Amino acid sequence: MARAYRLGEDLGTGAKCVKFLINLASTPSMAVVPTAVELCIQAAVDDPVGEARWQSWFDQWLLELQSAGAVELTLRLTDDAEIRRLNARFRGVDAPTDVLSFEFEADDTQALIAEEPLYLGDIVVSVPTATRQAREFGHTLEVELAWLAVHGLLHLLGWDHPDEQSWRAMVTQQARLLKGVNVVYDWPSVYPVG
């Protein structure tokens, strides 16, 4: 499939890309809706979660979000230097952040919709920032990475939080999705609204 990654040359330097296919059609609850998720994990830093856990999480999240059809996305685990560079380049903020999402943009939307798998975009997570936040918020790094990954996934699917109401709706959805993979995140006391 020909596509122009939003991050293009930014992804791939020194990173191993591990792809695996999640066949959601084999899941009993989705037997009627054939769905597959191709997840590409690029780890520029050590991956504290592991491929099997990422696979399980994205599998369950997209099942719960009732994603139909085949989709593909990239998860990039990186450091503060790289995410700071991306944040400055794409958001004009010269500082590291925890997670960035880059929805796939296509000139020909109809051609994109006809392709399978449908490429959703890229999620980039800073593991050092996630480590600091996990320590600050009093939970494990795995919990923080799950929170950030599902936040990025929701952005790829069109969710946003420009105001308090949309923020609350989005973090409520994140908490629900995390509960589905047995990850407990006490967001009301951890993240401020906004």
Curated annotation (Swiss-Prot):
Entries under SUPFAM superfamilies matching the protein: Metalloproteases ('zincins'), catalytic domain
Keyword S-adenosyl-L-methionine: no
Chain segments annotated as transmembrane: none
Primary location class: cytoplasm
GO terms of biological process kind: rRNA processing
Catalytic class of the enzyme: hydrolase
Keyword set includes Glycosyltransferase: no
GO CC annotation terms, alphabetical: cytoplasm
Positions annotated to bind Zn(2+): 151, 155, 161
Cofactor: Zn(2+)
InterPro entries linked: MetalPrtase_cat_dom_sf_prd, YbeY, YbeY_CS
Subcellular location: Cytoplasm
GO MF assignments: metalloendopeptidase activity; RNA endonuclease activity; zinc ion binding
EC number(s) recorded for this UniProt protein: 3.1.-.-
Pfam families from the UniProt entry: YbeY
Keyword tags: Cytoplasm, Endonuclease, Hydrolase, Metal-binding, Nuclease, Ribosome biogenesis, rRNA processing, Zinc
Annotated cofactor note: Binds 1 zinc ion.
PANTHER family with a match to the protein in the record: ENDORIBONUCLEASE YBEY, CHLOROPLASTIC
Family: Belongs to the endoribonuclease YbeY family.
Function: Single strand-specific metallo-endoribonuclease involved in late-stage 70S ribosome quality control and in maturation of the 3' terminus of the 16S rRNA.
Full protein name: Endoribonuclease YbeY
